[in-house]
Regions:
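Active-site and donor-binding regions of nucleotide-sugar-utilizing enzymes
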Residues: 4-182, 350
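Well-ordered, non-membrane alpha-helical segments in soluble/globular domains
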Residues: 14-18, 101-114, 134-142, 265-291, ...
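Short, charged/polar "capping" segments at the starts of alpha-helices
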Residues: 37-45, 135-138, 162-165, 249-250, ...
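Short acidic-hydrophobic, aromatic-tinged amphipathic segments that line or gate anion-handling sites
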Residues: 56-59, 319-326, 395-407
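A nucleotide-sugar donor-handling region in carbohydrate enzymes
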Residues: 156-252, 256, 260-261
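Conserved catalytic-core segment of nucleotide-activated headgroup transferases in glycan assembly
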Residues: 238-305
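Donor nucleotide-activated moiety binding/catalytic core segment of transferases
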Residues: 304-351, 355-356
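Catalytic binding pocket for nucleotide-activated donors in carbohydrate/polymer assembly enzymes
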Residues: 350-413, 417
Length: 426
């Protein structure tokens, strides 16, 4: 029997590597993930070459280039494969969905695996995952079916949302939970202490692990940053804005006639809500970039954000962080930071700087803007519980403004401190 890691994000893949090379180094394992961003096919190949996992399964979760995409690209004036190809794709997808209803979970999964071959669902006695998509539920359901319910189903840290009580409402029974900072989970004191296990923190002196994750995620020094006296990349006197991947309103929705607006009513409503988050996020970025006091502003693009976001960011003075498509945690393991300010809506990447590393690091001031961006459009109760707990643990460096004016005031004070520190270091 062996472990199976079902990963929806690169951060979960990083955590699977960490667990498999520490707690489970004497146990066989497979890894399953999806084509939800560009480059995941190459990522799967690099994972396979490490030999850490017996099998790497890659599930085709890419957007269907069917009739909907054909209409969208035609309205936007973009190239496409033509109506006939789009029709065939849509028909094939309809057949797949219909057959899946009759053939069950095993077919639904295996029919779209593009690397690794067919899964042996009976091979596992432990699964590590998070119940966030129907695909995960299907996979776990089939495993429980073929193991007569004997397989342990564990939840694996996937960022801040894993610390919310809502993750306990799953479509399958939970055995254990693996987290970096269990005490920050808002359900920790509700009878879960004995079932939450700490993921080993990443040791900055562990060069073997760094070599593994650098290879897997294809981390390279592109020459943008200097090194410190210990041989680490060094980011000094920087303001970093962490992107999150809400999409702006697609161009084709801005030019629809009344008939098409009626036909596409539901997707229009969805895009309208998401684009509101995008616009507020960009408003916060403009404040960050336009009031930097002459300091360098860097944007860390979300791994799943399209490169088309770059042009919008660069309307303000900024540079884009290198290695855009790798987890920030990999970059942090290769880098030291001095006199930084980090700003985001609610990105996990800031929290992991303080949560997942074993060594003591500079206490970087961090500003979380979710109360401003989500206000009126999204409930943020569980975000708030987590980030308030995070703030209580790091009261001198975590800031959660409630208004744009408060953000501007906090930011101005931090810029003054940054400039004073730079002068003192000269």
């Amino acid at each position: 029997m062996k472990n199976l890691y079902i990963c929806l994000t690169d951060f979960q893949i990083l955590n699977a590597l960490n667990l498999q090379l520490s707690k489970f180094k004497n146990k066989k394992a497979d890894l399953f993930f999806i084509t939800n961003k560009e480059g995941n096919e190459q990522l799967a190949e690099r994972l396979a070459t490490t030999g850490i996992f017996e099998k790497i399964y890659l599930f085709n979760n890419s957007r269907i280039q069917g009739l909907h995409q054909y209409v969208r690209s035609t309205v936007e004036g973009k190239t496409n494969k033509g109506f006939a190809a789009a029709l065939v794709t849509s028909v094939n997808e309809a057949v797949y969905k219909l057959r899946s209803k009759f053939s069950g979970e095993a077919y639904r999964i295996n029919a779209k695996i593009v690397l690794g071959g067919k899964m042996d669902f009976a091979a596992y006695d432990e699964v590590f995952c998070l119940d966030k998509r129907s695909l995960v539920v299907d996979c776990v359901t089939q495993i429980l079916k073929e193991t007569s319910g004997k397989c342990k189903i564990n939840l694996l840290d996937e960022g801040t949302s894993t610390y919310w009580r809502s993750i306990l409402k799953t479509n399958f029974p939970i055995s254990d939970i693996y987290l970096y900072a269990p005490e920050l989970a808002n359900y920790y004191a509700e009878g879960w202490q004995e079932r939450i296990y700490k993921i080993p923190k990443i040791d900055y002196s562990d060069e073997k692990f760094r070599a593994v994750i650098n290879k897997v995620f294809d981390f390279k020094d592109d020459g943008n940053y200097p090194y410190d006296d210990k041989g680490s990349l060094f980011l000094k006197d920087k303001i970093i804005f962490f992107d999150q991947n809400w999409d702006p309103m697609p161009e084709y929705f801005k030019h629809l006639n009344k008939f098409m607006m009626l036909l596409l009513h539901n997707p229009y409503k969805k895009h309208k809500k998401e684009s509101a988050f995008y616009e507020r996020k960009m408003q916060m970025f403009r404040i960050t970039a336009d009031n930097s006091g002459g300091n360098d502003v860097i944007v860390k693009l979300h791994p799943r954000s399209p490169l088309s976001f770059v042009a919008d960011y660069q309307k303000s003075k900024c540079t884009m962080a290198p290695n855009l498509k790798i987890p920030w945690e990999v970059f942090m393991d290769n880098c030291r930071f001095n006199n930084n300010i980090w700003v985001t809506v609610s990105s996990t990447a800031l929290c992991t700087y303080k949560m997942i590393f074993a060594d003591s690091r500079e206490d970087i001031p961090m500003i979380f803007l979710y109360k401003i961006v989500y206000d009126g459009n999204k409930s943020y109760q569980e975000d708030d519980q987590f980030f308030k707990g995070f703030q209580q643990k790091y009261p001198q460096s975590v800031f959660i403004p409630e208004t744009t004016e408060e953000f501007a005031q906090i930011y101005k004070k931090l810029i003054t401190k940054m400039n004073d520190k730079r002068k003192d270091n000269k």
